[in-house]
UniProtKB/Swiss-Prot annotation, chain A:
Species per Swiss-Prot/TrEMBL record: Bos taurus (Bovine)
Top-level taxon of origin: Eukaryota
Modified residues (N-acetylalanine): A2
Residues recorded with modification Phosphoserine: S3
Protein name: ATP synthase F(0) complex subunit f, mitochondrial
Length: 88, 226
């Protein structure tokens, strides 16, 4: 059955697996497109966790936890040697 | 252990691209703005804190000095947030780099001094000679005062760098010592306790910013407004 909704307007979860490469290639990869993506992501997180009536510490802690995780990934190469082993 | 101790202070690069730019810009994400009268808890808390700090710091200045409020408040927020983020595990603190602190100290100090010299030339020059010095001492004292003036930006930068770097190094060292002593025991509890106390004291890195901005402030005050 051919798609009645054009590929361009579908959200990611509605795209069939076979259509995935063409969907990815069709995304807006211009600088303003990428900036728009970051902005949308930021506001999605902000409006869900911070900009609410009774915001809790979770909104901030999740950001800091992600920051710690990213820094760990960045310095994994140097930290590899610190694993618990019998012989270093 | 030798090479390991200082690897946390090298500038983070990823495939030759400067990752440090992203790390320096990251604290700005944590200070959202809101143009509402009643905003969410996060923004309200930050606005309250900022109002408290700005009132306490800028009240001693006259109207000309108070034009620097935005600059000084951004400075204290930046240094405070950067230092506190550096206390998280594995993170990189930009203020440990002397280049960055010099880049902050020298322009701000120079701006204050030059403003003072342009607007109140006589008063600024008079700072080089304290009141009531005996006449034979005058040449030597002028030289000493000039040296003390020019050492101000260096002192500002080196003070911040040295304090933050020393604190981080100590945490690394004592943490490593605790791990090593874990198998030998008894002293472990004592060392872990020392780490805890050291970390708490290091959280007065926030007091560090206070010192930074306050010193800068004193300099600005003396030169600009007298």
């Amino acid at each position: 059955m051919a798609s009645v909704v054009p590929l361009k307007e579908k959200k990611l979860l509605e795209v069939k697996l076979g259509e995935l490469p063409s969907w990815i290639l069709m995304r807006d990869f211009t600088p303003s497109g990428i900036a728009g993506a970051f902005q949308r992501g930021y506001y999605r997180y902000y409006n869900k966790y911070v900009n609410v009536k009774k915001g809790s510490i979770a909104g901030l802690s999740m950001v800091l936890a992600a920051y710690v995780f990213l820094n760990y990934c960045r310095s994994y190469k140097e930290l590899k040697h610190e694993r618990l082993r019998k012989y270093h | 252990m030798n090479e390991n101790l200082f690897t946390s202070f090298i500038t983070p690069m990823i495939l030759g691209l400067p990752l440090v730019t992203l790390i320096v810009l990251f604290p700005s994400l944590l200070f959202p703005t809101s143009n509402r009268l009643v905003s969410n808890r996060f923004v309200t808390l930050q606005q309250w804190m900022l109002q408290l700090v700005s009132k306490q710091m800028m009240s001693i200045h006259n109207s000309k000095g108070q034009t620097w409020t935005l600059m000084l408040m951004s400075l204290i927020l930046f240094i405070g947030s950067t230092n506190l983020l550096g206390l998280l595990p594995h993170s990189f603190t930009p203020t440990t780099q002397l280049s960055m602190n010099l880049g902050m100290a020298i322009p701000l100090w120079a701006g204050a001094v030059i403003t003072g010299f342009r607007n109140k030339t006589k008063a600024s020059l008079a700072h080089f000679l304290p009141q009531g010095t005996p006449t034979p001492l005058i040449p030597m004292l002028v030289i000493i005062e000039t040296i003390s003036l020019f050492i101000q930006p260096m002192a500002l930068a080196v003070r911040l760098t040295a304090n933050i770097t020393a604190g981080h190094l100590l945490i690394h060292l004592i943490g490593g010592a605790t791990l090593a002593l874990m198998s030998i025991s008894t002293t472990t509890a004592l060392i872990t306790f020392t780490i805890l106390i050291l970390l708490t004291i290091l959280e007065f890195a926030v007091a560090m910013i206070q010192a930074y901005v306050f010193t800068l402030l004193v300099s600005l005050y003396l030169h600009d407004n007298t």
